[in-house]
């Protein structure tokens, strides 16, 4: 098995991201790697451009607080498994934030789900995963969540 020092896990709080986090925790335990958990968000420009709406700072603050709390919950899962880690919260397009964070922190591996909370369906991969694979400075391991029992 490869020896990893730093593993980046982009999290959007979907079931696919949860599955990726579980796998990343196992890989980190086996290799002694540190986890970097990243959540990136942005307001779609179509909302502000089409309606000329300025989003109140209190709304942005609420988004940041909720995301920070969810990131800390994810980090607590890693720490409970004996894995060290840190969190990153960025306001940027997700794939760009993933690639930039991976480069800045000299990440050895990105582990991410193939679909998130975008609501868009792509034939094989979600758009963020697909773009990340193309621009990432390191290997990207993608996985899909287990199908839900019917």
Give, region by region, the residue ranges found by the protein language model.
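Small/aliphatic-rich secondary-structure junction motif
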Residues: 2-53
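General small-molecule cofactor/ligand-binding pocket signal
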Residues: 36-38, 86-90, 141
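Short, hinge-like loop/turn segments at secondary-structure boundaries
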Residues: 52-56, 104-106, 128-129
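Glycine-rich, Arg-bearing micro-motifs that act as flexible, cationic patches
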Residues: 109-131, 149-150
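Short, conserved catalytic or interaction motifs in soluble domains
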Residues: 13, 122, 145
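Structural beta-alpha unit
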Residues: 1-2, 76-110, 147-150
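Short, flexible loop segments at boundaries between secondary-structure elements
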Residues: 140-146
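Acidic, proline/glycine-rich short linear motifs
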Residues: 40-69, 149-150
